[in-house]
UniProtKB/Swiss-Prot annotation:
Disulfide bonds: none annotated. InterPro entries: BTB/POZ_dom, Quinoprotein_ADH-like_sf, SKP1/BTB/POZ_sf, WD40/YVTN_repeat-like_dom_sf. Belongs to the mimivirus BTB/WD family. This is Putative BTB/POZ domain and WD-repeat protein R731. Residues 228-246 have a biased composition (Acidic residues).
Length: 518
């Protein structure tokens, strides 16, 4: 007769607690204490590569006493007990990190990249840096430093190589996606959709410097959302809120859309500004104001600090596009492009053109527009003249400047993207056939950095591409049937502020090193 022994974890726990048939006394010593355990060699052998090697190849295989110098005796004790089925508790971040160090010593899988590290109190942050310094600045540790940097912490005391490592794991931007059913936010940090706001009537959306948004919607927002009260527009202002009689135009509401983030949990809150508009909206970082088309001939200026209308500009033709660029604004009407001085309200120049596509770059002081579908015109706001023409053979659907003004790109109806150098008189550098990457072609694209393009097709498949290396960085599939894409835009991500802070310190340290060497 053959008997099968069933040793579950409760049997092993009893075996340990009662010290039945123990054949080894394990001494665990760190800088503070020594803990002695009565254990079973066969359990250690089967549970841990370190002990397996020890009891196979070294003198300890015949010894009844084993002495180990360890990083943390208490945690090593807990890990050895876990071989018997005892739960391994992780009460704080220090315990979690020390557990990784001990497991690494014992040749166990640490699973460090999967640890949901507990929050690190501000008073413990320097201690955390000291601990990380011992185990090495791997990607996991760098990300945890970013996630736990206290407010107003002096990052300048970090060495340049550490700052560059931190910058490499910062996620400065999220991706805002407008679809038929509403708006979505894709997090590159968490590699998933983190917010879905269902409102199929959202027309336009603009981000402000504080990370919030203003958007226009033709539906009544859910009563659970916050309504305007103290912030409501003054009734004495001429808001042009009377319903328009113009055929094809209807007034819609302007809302403020705020996002609160707790790790990968994003929540939206909505505030009704009390304003009615009919057309596009545009945000001016220079003035911290939102420009809104209140009827087809008028642009009103909404100050986001005092939350009231402060100015109005009147035009003779239907307004199609507005783009504030520092102290000027490009206004595209149904028959021409007007350059407006925002300081005195005077028209600086007019261009006869019927276009619905423009892109501007405030650093270069220029904007680009499409003329007759196939011609790109580069217009200087300094000379008030066209400085460059790019002629193309097919219809151009999108144009865009890179953040640091290095590149100008456009995409034609065949989903081929053309890359031009702004530093070399708009010379063509390369072309990219995005039909190879996106089955349904390019619906919209956006620069995430000065050299990284994010392109999306109408269904929601995303391709992230490096202009300089010509390599695909990532493919993302957030496609949905019967929920087509309208457009995408980058928005401030969870690491936006810290990214800017680190970038500034790196620049200062680099300049300092250069000045010393020279």
């Amino acid at each position: 007769m053959i008997y099968h022994i069933n040793m579950d974890k409760h049997s092993l726990i009893d075996l340990y607690n009662n010290e039945v048939l123990t054949d080894c006394q394990l001494h665990l010593t760190d800088s503070i204490e020594t803990i002695v355990m009565n254990v079973h060699k066969n359990i250690l052998y089967m549970s841990c590569p370190y002990f397996k090697s020890m009891f196979t190849n070294f003198r300890e295989q015949k010894s009844s006493t084993v002495k180990l110098d360890v990083h943390n005796a208490r945690i090593t004790y807990d890990i050895v007990k876990s071989f018997y089925g005892f739960p391994l508790e992780e009460p704080n971040w220090k315990y979690q990190i020390d557990t990784h160090i001990v497991k690494d010593f014992l040749l166990l899988e640490t699973g460090l990249e999967n640890i949901n590290l507990l929050p690190i109190p501000a008073e413990d942050f320097d201690n955390f840096i000291d601990v990380v310094d011992k185990i090495g600045y791997n990607e996991f540790c760098l990300k945890k430093i970013i996630d736990n940097i206290p407010d107003n912490y002096d990052l300048s005391k970090f060495p340049l190589d550490l700052l560059n490592g931190l910058l490499a794991v910062c996620f400065k931007y999220d991706l805002h996606i407008s679809r038929e059913t509403g708006v979505y936010i894709w997090s590159f940090k968490y590699n998933k959709l983190v917010l879905s706001y269902f409102d199929s009537s959202i027309i336009d959306i603009e981000q402000t410097f504080d990370g919030g948004f203003y958007f226009s919607s033709s539906t009544i927002i859910d009563s659970n959302h916050e309504e305007s009260s103290d912030d409501e527009v003054n009734d004495d202002e001429d808001t042009d809120n009377e319903d328009t009689d113009d055929e094809g135009y209807c007034q819609i509401s302007l809302f403020k859309f705020n996002i609160s983030r707790t790790n990968d949990k994003y929540e939206a809150s909505i505030l009704n500004t009390g304003l009615k508009i009919i057309g596009p909206i545009a945000y001016s970082k220079h003035f911290n104001q939102v420009f809104i088309v209140t009827d087809k001939y008028n642009i009103c200026v909404y100050d986001t600090d005092i939350k009231n209308l402060v100015n109005k500009f009147v035009f003779n033709d239907t307004i199609e596009i507005i783009a504030p660029i520092k102290d000027k604004m490009v206004v595209v009407t149904s028959i021409q492009i007007i350059i407006l001085n925002l300081l005195d309200g005077k028209n600086l120049s007019k261009i006869d053109s019927n276009t619905n596509i423009i892109s501007y770059n405030s650093n270069l002081g220029v904007f680009a527009y499409i003329n007759n579908n196939t011609n790109v015109c580069i217009y200087s706001l300094e000379s008030l003249s066209i400085t460059t023409n790019i002629n193309h053979s097919t219809t151009i659907n999108h144009i865009l400047y890179s953040p640091k003004s290095k590149y100008f790109i456009f995409c034609d109806e065949n989903s081929i993207i053309y890359v031009y150098s702004t530093k070399d008189n708009y010379s063509l550098i390369k072309t990219i056939d995005f039909k190879k990457f996106l089955k349904f072609g390019v619906k919209d694209f956006e620069f995430m950095t000065s050299k990284i393009i994010v392109a999306i097709d109408i269904k929601g498949k995303i391709c992230i591409w490096n202009i300089e290396t010509e390599q695909i960085i990532q493919n993302i599939d957030c496609s949905e049937d019967y929920n087509n894409i309208y457009n995408i835009q980058k928005i401030n991500g969870p690491d936006y502020s810290i990214h800017k802070k680190i970038s500034k310190i790196i620049q200062e340290k680099t300049q300092s090193k250069l000045s010393i060497s020279s």
